[in-house]
Amino acid sequence: MSKADLTKKAQEVAAMFDGVAKNYDKANDLLSFGSARIWRKQVAKAVDPQSGQTILDLAAGTGASSVAFLKPGVKVVAADFSNGMLEQGRRRHPEIEFVFADATNLPFLEAEFDTVTISFGLRNVENTELALSEMLRVLKPGGKLVVCEFSAIPNKFLHSMYRFYLKNLLPKISALVSKTPEAYSYLAESIDAWPKQAELAKLIEKVGYQSVGFRNQTLGIVAIHTGYKPQKAN
């Protein structure tokens, strides 16, 4: 696969995730030292599902993130472009509707969802701005966007230590827990190429979201961005 900062072909990324689907959640918990579960809880708080709402969870993978949104009266749609991930998700969580979807061309109607969320998937999209525009399109007026993504640690010393872990230790450790360690080499590359917190916030605003903000998690290893689709003009 070409380096993440040069190209992100959808078919290549999908095939890579097909290969790791079976053990993906366990590997993530191990390689993040349990932080992945904490981040999912923080995303659930940001989404704050309410009865009567319909929530779209993009890049949902096996549905590990989607389960937290299952509240009485809440409809959850889990979408992903990896058939391997979707197969695992349908097997593990039959109570959730799983849909094959490309984030840059969503198979949903305009203004269909109260909340759209995507966790650790926006980096893998070929056209980030187009994907954010599609999310805006399918949101209802006043609807909420929640993006959870790897980010940049503000502290330079800690950031350098984290980069060393990503580039030198993560690939070696992943080889012990995954049959496709190249997926985690791609992870390190894509994190390194990803815009910092403020840059992503500006892009979200550029697309047309209002009241955009972000909160760092775990020293800034991850950031949760939020924004809202404008209400229709009277």
Regions found by a protein language model. Give the residues of each.
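Core SAM-dependent methyltransferase catalytic element
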Residues: A201, V207-N234
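Conserved alpha-helix/loop element of class I SAM-dependent methyltransferases that forms part
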Residues: F33-Q53
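C-terminal alpha-helical "lid/dimerization" subdomain adjacent to the S-adenosyl-L-methionine
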Residues: Q11, C148-L203, V207, G213
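A short glycine-rich, Lys/Arg-flanked "PGG" loop and its adjoining helix->strand segment in the class I
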Residues: E129-P141
